[in-house]
């Protein structure tokens, strides 16, 4: 089915498509399906160099070969300074960001995001909205700003610029199992969204983490094993990596509150101590708002506030 979705996308746009390639295992599988399983070699791989990748990921990308590299206009520190820190999830950070803006402008009473954070939003039947997230209301009083803008500024915008300049449409390796928002998008639009404002193909939407690991294991394809380690199976036949499970942005805090210890930051302290020191240390209070400084990004204070151990 994945191959069919890719071929439909490729044919619809007369081959003017590209593969969004992060160097992670999911997009590595997607690129292998396009090139080696389907035998389509005129689909370029495009990598966004955000500066937030593990060194091992960047090294792997360089070894892949013909990869187009694009870069954002702002670095992570600049995004934090202007918009805020990425915490809990994209959805929660966005709600906190816009609710705080509504509060500052004195219009929070009927503001949707504020009401959801207070647990007051209702659906069309007058029932409590499933999107209420009062658990995170305390972030409205955090000594730092929250935002999900980093994903847009550092990943999506460089890709959109590439799309505008090249005329090519994206194929991405996101999966519905990764988040509620991605699942909802897939259920509404399917794998290929031809008619949206930004047409996009997500041919692996119905895959799971196990599917990805099984593909790599079975097809014996090259992947960033320096960071993931080996792919093995346990007694029940479940696949797992011996090192990192996910390799997104190194300093991202989305989802870290859900992880068992050692969590991503505790593992980072062992595997990449210099990166750990830079992201955890530093930070300064500027007019009541916590911001990065010359010593580091100051994530330690943020993680303390949301109750995530990083030591």
Where are these regions (language model features)?
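ATP-dependent adenylation/nucleotidyltransferase module used to activate substrates
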Residues: 1-211, 218
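ATP/NTP-dependent adenylation/nucleotidyl-transfer catalytic domains that generate, transfer
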Residues: 197, 208-311
